[in-house]
Amino acid sequence: MTSVRCKLAQYLEDLEDVDLKKFKMHLEDYPPEKGCIPVPRGQMEKADHLDLATLMIDFNGEEKAWAMAVWIFAAINRRDLWEKAKKDQPEWNDTCTSHSSMVCQEDSLEEEWMGLLGYLSRISICKKKKDYCKMYRRHVRSRFYSIKDRNARLGESVDLNSRYTQLQLVKEHPSKQEREHELLTIGRTKMRDSPMSSLKLELLFEPEDGHSEPVHTVVFQGAAGIGKTILARKIMLDWALGKLFKDKFDYLFFIHCREVSLRTPRSLADLIVSCWPDPNPPVCKILRKPSRILFLMDGFDELQGAFDEHIGEVCTDWQKAVRGDILLSSLIRKKLLPKASLLITTRPVALEKLQHLLDHPRHVEILGFSEAKRKEYFFKYFSNELQAREAFRLIQENEVLFTMCFIPLVCWIVCTGLKQQMETGKSLAQTSKTTTAVYVFFLSSLLQSRGGIEEHLFSDYLQGLCSLAADGIWNQKILFEECDLRKHGLQKTDVSAFLRMNVFQKEVDCERFYSFSHMTFQEFFAAMYYLLEEEAEGETVRKGPGGCSDLLNRDVKVLLENYGKFEKGYLIFVVRFLFGLVNQERTSYLEKKLSCKISQQVRLELLKWIEVKAKAKKLQWQPSQLELFYCLYEMQEEDFVQSAMDHFPKIEINLSTRMDHVVSSFCIKNCHRVKTLSLGFFHNSPKEEEEERRGGRPLDQVQCVFPDTHVACSSRLVNCCLTSSFCRGLFSSLSTNRSLTELDLSDNTLGDPGMRVLCEALQHPGCNIQRLWLGRCGLSHQCCFDISSVLSSSQKLVELDLSDNALGDFGIRLLCVGLKHLLCNLQKLWLVSCCLTSACCQDLALVLSSNHSLTRLYIGENALGDSGVQVLCEKMKDPQCNLQKLGLVNSGLTSICCSALTSVLKTNQNFTHLYLRSNALGDTGLRLLCEGLLHPDCKLQMLELDNCSLTSHSCWNLSTILTHNHSLRKLNLGNNDLGDLCVVTLCEVLKQQGCLLQSLQLGEMYLNRETKRALEALQEEKPELTIVFEISW
């Protein structure tokens, strides 16, 4: 009997060379879903018919090898061999025999053959589709594999994967920001919390939860230079590499909005053709499943102007050619291919307009680089690890610039400048602090490569470039035609020179249109336009384009008058750059480098403008004080800033970012005439609770005006997210502003390092801080030595709140060293909830007997216990003790400590306020206190006994106290189960003429209607008595 291998070889021998090659090709690509193993090409290349049969059986066994051959005969259209092999199929087992006999009937063979041809046809179509996708992915991979640096020479490029550094992304609803160019406000506090809300790229289009609708539109928002375009290109590359959206989208099309916004009509099919590797893409087949397509639109804000004119026009036909902005508008509004997905990048300026076009979009904010990613970027940029380490160390030392490097564009500029310095062998000097300084340095490095351009010609080119930039800013224009260049004295050949310098680049796909390589460069040169002058017949004038009279009429005064009026703030960065450029050292540097004349008149105009704005009332179109501070900070010239800050009678700003802290610190330390200073978190609201009602906390916000000087002396920075690294510059203002006497830093994570910086400032002779609040500042015992040094060296500090900091007993021991010092003049001290135990009470007791200035001590919410209070009471009986108010709220006390407190009430006539809320004293404890309260030397005015486990058994003692104690004015008894009879009895006592109580707080009690009526009757009969009660039924 002939073996299966020989039979199979005989069939293969009937194949001619062409068919045998086809057979091998199908054998290599055999569908895996059929359960057989494809034979590798390398083992089939030189195999003859016998070798091939052997390989098929070795890989899959006889039965599967035969089935593979039968299927491939059909695939290569050899029906004769297919029918013969079907009829000649060996008997494998009973099941197969039965099956074989059934399918070998002539009718069955015919039906099976036709069905198999249909299946193979469908397989062919799918394979063609896969071939299209595979070819397009290869094209996208090739197109987006590399990027060009802005300063790259011809032919130079950088591998995108090796340079790309991960950006932080968070889901966020769009905010109604009025300013487009607030680059520095992107690094805000939530950036530190972003791991909790960060979004992974692969989840961009996933629903929020299992019940939500899928997401079809995603909007990436971020300021200029934050990395929107590079992220969009990375998404394209990762998709092409099969790393992203592999099973979600068959096609991703990258659209440059500024290119599509041109007036040339085009259809959606034309857009796809422009993305395809050859001129004949299968558009119909691509658009057959729009849900498998993602359009990635980069730079929506760059076509905003065009949208204004044609927002109502719609295109629904993918073959119809329309204006580019109408085409994109139709895609965005889901009028064209409504089932397709969109990913749009934009600056915040265009968010409001974009929002009206979208239906349920997901907004994702790009926050830039985290601190760790900044370091990663440096090490990726510099191929030499030693250079990377040196550059990163330098930037880290300049904290302001390191902060700015969260913006990828700034990071690139800084790295470029440092690398050029390294390559020339120059030592790395202290890097500049501001955006202007970074751009000036970058421009100077570009000028080194200006080639053979003559000096006077270059000056003309630069002037034309600056006027072009300014004209574009005023008209909100970023794409320029050749006629625009000619209007500003520039020729096509001139632009080539700038292309070599990478300041002004020619568009690759739009040959007749030109743009600045980045919007911020256009803003920088627009600011320079207002500074460049030339000598004309003995007079210095500002030079401008001959055909642009409108721009000549828009001088610095007009620029500043319009600053703040533009709804979207297009002039903000231009004015900031203007301030930065008039720095005298920078002006001299530019005049030398550019061989040009810089206007000095602009400095006077800017100072006059600041003076007017500093005194102006708050109006919607007025720039905020913080924005003015940003302008002054950009200048980095302290004499000018001091002159400007003299015009601010009142400073009231909200801080929300790190740069806000840095900028405000720089300006405030140069401010010597301010009368009111108020700094706060944007969402901060004042806490208006009484000090006594708090039973141990000062106000979180204080606005105190001394009547003799009429100068506000309060500064509050509550919940400003200050950290220790931002404190040094801010605290330096404490030594220069002598009118500042109150400082509230509550709810800021200063930590011990920040506290150390603050203590250095507090010990400065020029510092006049008297009241300092540091609640919830993340302090530990390690800072207590520094605080103790302040207490022992400064007699000005009279009030200190350290509540809600884990100082511990050891921290209090260190603190008490300063409190016992002869120079310590502290009067009020809050140590509420500081992780204290009875072990600290001995140290505090020694303070009470030696410090004669301390009159208020609040140490509640600590586990002091009865033993701790007993130790304190021993020293409070000392005649030298001047303590007036003691807060022991929720301190784990029982009736055991009440005898010691009674002794204090009997002996210390200075003692007037005692807070015992939330301690289980019980009726026994009150009975013991009653003895002290009835003593003739007792001068207590305020007694707080809320939630102290009192019952109706305390009624007689309470009545006795109210009747015989003539000093007590306020009594709190809330949240005690006194009962109706006791309360009614107290009402009768309070009606007596000898009772001098002014305030009775009963809080929440279970009282009946009769008791309520008794309280109301008492209130009417004795209006000078305030009764606060809340009845629970």
UniProtKB/Swiss-Prot annotation:
Result of altering S803D = Mimics phosphorylation state; impaired ability to recruit NEK7, leding to decreased activation of the NLRP3 inflammasome
The protein's matches in SMART domains, at most eight in alphabetical order, are given as: FISNA, LRR_RI, PYRIN
Q: List the expressing tissues.
A: Expressed with high levels in peripheral blood leukocytes, including Th2 lymphocytes and macrophages. Expressed at low levels in resting osteoblasts (at protein level).
InterPro entries assigned to the protein according to its UniProt record, in alphabetical order: DAPIN, DEATH-like_dom_sf, Leu-rich_rpt, LRR_dom_sf, NACHT-assoc, NACHT_NTPase, NLRP_HD2, NLRP_innate_immun_reg
Q: Where are the LRR repeats?
A: 739-759, 768-789, 796-816, 825-846, 853-873, 882-903, 910-930, 939-960, 967-988
For this chain, the annotated S-S bridges are C6-C104
Point out residues bearing the modification Phosphoserine: S3, S157, S194, S197, S261, S291, S330, S725, S732, S803, S1032
Which terms in the GO cellular component ontology are assigned? Answer: canonical inflammasome complex; cytoplasm; cytosol; endoplasmic reticulum; extracellular region; Golgi membrane; interphase microtubule organizing center; membrane
Q: Give the family from UniProt.
A: Belongs to the NLRP family.
Domain comment from the record reads as follows: The pyrin domain (also called DAPIN domain or PYD) is involved in PYCARD/ASC-binding.
Q: Name it.
A: NACHT, LRR and PYD domains-containing protein 3
Protein species of origin: Mus musculus (Mouse)
